[in-house]
Amino acid sequence: MSLSVEAKAKIVSEFGRGTNDSGSTEVQVALLTAQINHLQGHFAEHKKDHHSRRGLLRMVSQRRKLLDYLKRKDVARYTALIERLGLRR
């Protein structure tokens, strides 16, 4: 269910400020988005997996909180991230 190490490293290098920047808000949102997209494919096949669906809702909520924080702190970074990830907000 989780992302591979290579996929995480690619996301960190793409969205982070450095190679080891895994804690910035942009990287956290990008990692959550990748995991959410992966789980949506899982639910197309396993419709009754309610245990994992709860985890998905938790991830969506966490991503929303991080995006709200970024919007409060720096609107320019927020809009750039939304554009890069293709989110609807």
Swiss-Prot record:
- Look up the domain of life of the source: Bacteria
A GO term, aspect molecular function: rRNA binding
Coiled-coil segments, which residues? Answer: none
Q: Carries keyword Ribonucleoprotein?
A: yes
List the Gene3D superfamilies: 6.10.250.3130, S15/NS1, RNA-binding
Q: Name one GO biological process term.
A: translation
> Mind telling me which GO cellular component terms the entry cites?
cytosolic small ribosomal subunit
SUPFAM superfamilies given in the database record: S15/NS1 RNA-binding domain (SSF47060)
What keywords sit in the KW lines? Ribonucleoprotein, Ribosomal protein, RNA-binding, rRNA-binding
Q: Which CDD domains match?
A: Ribosomal_S15p_S13e (cd00353)
Q: Is-annotated flag, keyword Isomerase?
A: no
Q: Quaternary state and partners of this protein?
A: Part of the 30S ribosomal subunit. Forms a bridge to the 50S subunit in the 70S ribosome, contacting the 23S rRNA.
Q: What does this protein do?
A: One of the primary rRNA binding proteins, it binds directly to 16S rRNA where it helps nucleate assembly of the platform of the 30S subunit by binding and bridging several RNA helices of the 16S rRNA.
| NCBIfam families the UniProt entry points to | S15_bact (TIGR00952)
Similarity annotation: Belongs to the universal ribosomal protein uS15 family.
Q: What is this protein called?
A: Small ribosomal subunit protein uS15
Q: What organism does the record attribute this protein to?
A: Citrobacter koseri (strain ATCC BAA-895 / CDC 4225-83 / SGSC4696)
Lineage of producing organism: Bacteria, Pseudomonadati, Pseudomonadota, Gammaproteobacteria, Enterobacterales
Gene, per the UniProt record: rpsO
